[in-house]
Regions:
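Intramembrane catalytic core of multi-pass membrane enzymes that act on lipidic substrates
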Residues: 86-189
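Membrane-interface helix-loop-helix junctions at transmembrane boundaries of multi-pass membrane enzymes
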Residues: 203-209, 298-321, 405-422, 454-458, ...
Length: 531
């Protein structure tokens, strides 16, 4: 029976698969106004007189419809992805638009962060320093929509974030609905730029742009959290990926300058954009001083790493120093200009560490603390979860910094290698950072598809994306502590991923349909162009 069902899912006509995604997206948009991150005062249901859909038995029924909607979106995505991976079909702009467009009409989903964004914008607009005071310093209509945990918390974001929020709230005033609509437009525009940049990176590196956009941008995790949740990571990654694309496409020096400036703008939005800058330097080094011998591949043996370290020629060393200092200077200049133009202070630097209130097992420190608290409390009743986390977080943060350096040292042979390294670096932050949320994974996911060649890796990443899409409910509460939920979702999603993506006929590689001619010009020291 499973084989019959699997064959029907795998061979589903593309038009039907896309239609299921559209139905799921429309249904999710409708459900968001009942079971999403709804407003405490006002909102669509109150305006329509349907407030009874926001509580009681009807609320429970809408929750079921919300999960059905997400499952339809996941099924549509994986079936279309199977046709891209196995048959080399194109993703197509119309398919992407069909999946995303209905969510323009959705309310905030899976997080209340958008209300904090608007509140922080009003702080900047009304002359408050959001790095010194929280939402409670400027009470008003928006204050009541901010999550209680964050009403006295300063913002961890950069001056560009506050500048955007200030501009939006100057236009919309204290109208929450209008502010959300403008943020939704910004999210959609950033999403489009991200898709364009990821497709361009894939072409430059000889990969399939359709696979890259499908796995890195169009996946349900991104669509739900970037468009439904309107998180500023979508704008940050649009700037980062556009910067990396310019670093590959423009002449080496200009590419480094333009790319560093855009990544600097990303840093002014959220500091984690900085992790991509060292790998832009490796792109510059490879294009100016030549690539190192060997295959640009994610897996690297220890002896290969040691051999690469010994092959640090004077030309590469000089190019690296010039490129590193130059990129850092341009990036810093970009941040300085944005900080000055926005009228913000440098207080955001002290807030980079962000908050530590969020506890979930996506962060290794929180996961280990959850396992250790019971046995340790048997030894000493005075040992609590918070004490264990306080000890583990500095350790994992130190390991994260070490991991970032290791990624930079290992993946440096050429442009594709640099993208592998950037992906690995962002993945390290998603595991070892003190606080991790599902949309943080969109940074490594956005870059993953531009270099991947192994079908097994695509299956695993697709599976993780689908599972992660099912871990947060509409209001932002997580299901990561519901073991039965994770087991059932994990098993079903693994069966779905392997059914749609696996093709035993051609082994583990993605096939010739994904091997495109690379377009990255690599110049040696004597300016001899090579590929």
């Amino acid at each position: 029976m499973l084989r019959t069902v699997g064959a029907r899912v795998r061979d589903m006509p593309r038009r039907r698969a896309v239609l299921l995604g559209v139905i799921g997206s429309v249904l999710l948009a409708l459900c968001s106004h009942s079971v999403g991150a709804t407003r405490n005062r006002g909102g669509v249901l109150q305006e329509l007189g349907w407030s009874n859909l926001g509580f009681g038995h009807l609320y429970g029924i809408v929750v079921v419809f919300m999960w059905v909607a997400i499952l339809l979106m996941i099924l549509s995505w994986i079936v279309v992805g199977g046709r891209i991976v196995r048959l080399g079909e194109a993703l197509g702009a119309r398919t992407l638009i069909a999946w995303v467009a209905p969510l323009f009409f959705a309310g905030p989903l899976m997080s209340r962060d958008i209300y904090s964004y608007l509140m922080q914008g009003t702080l900047a607009r009304d002359g408050f320093n959001a790095y010194d005071v929280g939402a409670s310093a400027n009470p008003g209509r928006m204050f009541f929509e901010v999550s209680g945990d964050w009403r006295n918390t300063t913002t961890p974001y950069g001056p560009l974030h506050l500048w955007i929020g200030e501009g939006i709230t100057r236009i919309t005033g204290d109208n929450i609905t209008a502010g959300i609509i403008v943020y939704k437009i910004l999210s959609l525009a950033s999403f489009a730029v991200l898709a364009w940049a990821v497709a361009g990176l894939a072409r430059q590196l000889g990969s399939s742009p359709h696979l890259a956009v499908w796995i890195g941008v169009a996946n349900p995790l991104a669509v739900i959290h970037f468009i439904g949740g309107m998180h500023n990571e979508v704008t940050m990654m649009a700037l980062v990926c556009a910067g990396l694309l310019l670093g590959l496409r423009a002449a080496p020096v200009r590419g480094l300058v333009y790319g560093s400036a855009l990544i600097g703008a990303g840093v002014a939005l959220k500091a984690t954009a900085l992790f991509a800058l060292p790998f832009l330097v490796w792109v510059f080094v490879a294009r100016r001083a030549g690539t190192l011998p060997g295959e640009d591949a994610p897996r690297r043996r220890l002896r290969e790493i040691l051999r690469d370290l010994r092959q640090f020629t004077p030309a590469r060393l000089v190019t690296m120093l010039i490129g590193g200092l130059g990129s850092a200077a341009v990036m810093l200049a970009s941040v300085v200009v944005i900080t000055w133009a926005s009228g913000q202070t440098w207080g955001w630097v002290a807030e980079i560490s962000g908050n530590t209130k969020v506890i979930n097992p996506l962060s290794l420190a929180s996961l280990l603390a959850g396992f250790l608290v019971r046995p340790l409390s048997l030894v000493n009743e005075e040992i609590y979860f918070n004490e264990i986390v306080a000890v583990l977080r500095p350790v994992t943060m130190a390991l994260m910094l070490l991991g970032l350096v290791v990624c930079w040292l290992i993946w440096r042979r050429g442009p594709r290698d640099a993208m592998v390294g950037a992906t690995a670096a962002y993945a390290v932050t998603c595991v070892l950072n003190a606080v991790v949320l599902p949309w943080y994974y969109m940074a490594p996911l956005a870059l993953f598809g531009v270099w991947v060649r192994d079908r097994r890796a695509v299956i695993v990443v697709a599976w993780l994306s689908m599972v992660m899409s099912m871990t947060f409910d509409g209001g932002g509460n997580n299901r990561l502590y519901s073991l039965w939920w994770l087991i059932v979702v994990g098993v079903v999603m693994w069966w779905t991923a392997t059914t749609c993506l696996r093709d035993s006929a051609d082994g583990h590689r993605l096939g010739t349909t994904h091997d495109l001619p690379g377009e990255v010009p690599v110049e040696s020291v004597d300016r001899t162009p090579r590929q």
